[in-house]
UniProtKB/Swiss-Prot annotation:
Transmembrane portions of the chain: none
Activity modulation comment: Inhibited by EDTA.
Molecular function via GO: bis(5'-nucleosyl)-tetraphosphatase (asymmetrical) activity; GTP binding; nickel cation binding; phosphatase activity
Keyword terms of this UniProt record: Germination, GTP-binding, Hydrolase, Nickel, Nucleotide-binding
Location of this chain's protein in the cell: Forespore
InterPro entries linked: Ap4A_hydrolase, Bis(5'-nucleosyl)-tetraP_PrpE, Calcineurin-like_PHP_ApaH, Metallo-depent_PP-like, MPP_PrpE-like
Signal peptide start-end: none
Family designation: Belongs to the PrpE family.
Protein name in UniProt: Bis(5'-nucleosyl)-tetraphosphatase PrpE [asymmetrical]
Cofactor note: Nickel. 100-fold less efficiency with manganese.
Reaction(s) the record says it catalyses: P(1),P(4)-bis(5'-guanosyl) tetraphosphate + H2O = GMP + GTP + 2 H(+)
Sections of the chain in a coiled coil: none
Main location group: other
Length: 244
């Protein structure tokens, strides 16, 4: 099986559909179909900050329900899930845009989209081990010796990265460069931390190229070990791209 992984769409529905088509898929009845039988994998953070989070949810969740795509959650997915469940969360850092989109829907539409997303989140794996263990898709990455583990510590790492506990002046967390020490045999494909170009280190690649911050949306083709990108239509924000 061959896969195309996309991460950190963040409500950029138009760029997502453009990238899916550039990767060679046609969308039939809401489902992406590739003539070579390739499968799309979404690596989390479908929503927040961008203009069309609801459309992204409908597309990914709809295709997932039909068994046509794979999906693993990101930290923004986790927060949206808790928000929809009625748990106390701070509606900020992008969640406010998705919440505003939901409020514009009719009561029935809001209920339908909320239930669709919650089902997606509840039925998805924390991370995906594919191609006989040669490929791992995890939103913020995973250490080699944690592959196959599902403890709370591993969950926190997969969703939030290798955080130090310290923050930048604007409040964003400072993270360790776990990829530099990665020594596993499997390819780990992840996102979470925006980079201007896909960052390949050892057998890891960060494909969050900051579409929602005006850069580009990137897909990773496996087993080809190639990337394909489309430009963002949003304003470029240099401040969102930091050294690892």
């Amino acid at each position: 099986m061959a896969y195309d992984i996309i991460s950190d769409i963040h409500g950029c529905y138009d760029e997502m559909t453009a990238l899916i088509q550039k990767l060679g898929y046609t969308i039939k009845n809401g489902v992406p179909v590739h003539e070579e039988g390739r499968v799309l994998v979404f690596a989390g953070d479908l929503t927040d900050r961008g203009p069309k989070s609801i459309e992204v949810i409908r597309f990914v969740a709809g295709a997932y329900e039909k068994g046509a795509v794979r999906y693993v959650p990101g930290n923004h997915c986790n927060k949206l899930y808790r928000y929809l469940k009625g748990n106390p969360v701070k509606v900020m850092h992008g969640l406010e845009t998705t919440a505003a989109e939901l409020e514009e829907l009719s009561k029935d539409e809001k209920k339908s989209v909320s239930e669709q997303f919650m089902k997606l989140y509840e039925t998805a794996p924390l991370y995906d081990i594919l191609h006989n263990g040669e490929l791992v898709v995890a939103h913020a990455g995973i250490r080699a010796d944690d592959i196959g583990k599902y403890t709370r510590r591993v969950k926190d790492f997969v969703l939030y990265g290798d955080v130090t506990g310290e923050t930048y002046p604007d409040g964003r967390p400072i993270r360790r460069d776990w990829a530099a020490a990665y020594n596993g045999k499997a390819w780990v494909v992840y996102g979470h931390t925006p980079v201007k170009e896909p960052r390949k280190v050892n057998r890891t690649i960060n494909i969050d190229t900051g579409c929602v911050f005006g850069n580009q949306l990137t897909g990773f083709r496996f087993p080809e070990i190639e990337t394909v990108s489309v430009p963002s239509s949003l304003p470029y924000d240099e401040s969102r791209f930091r050294p690892i």
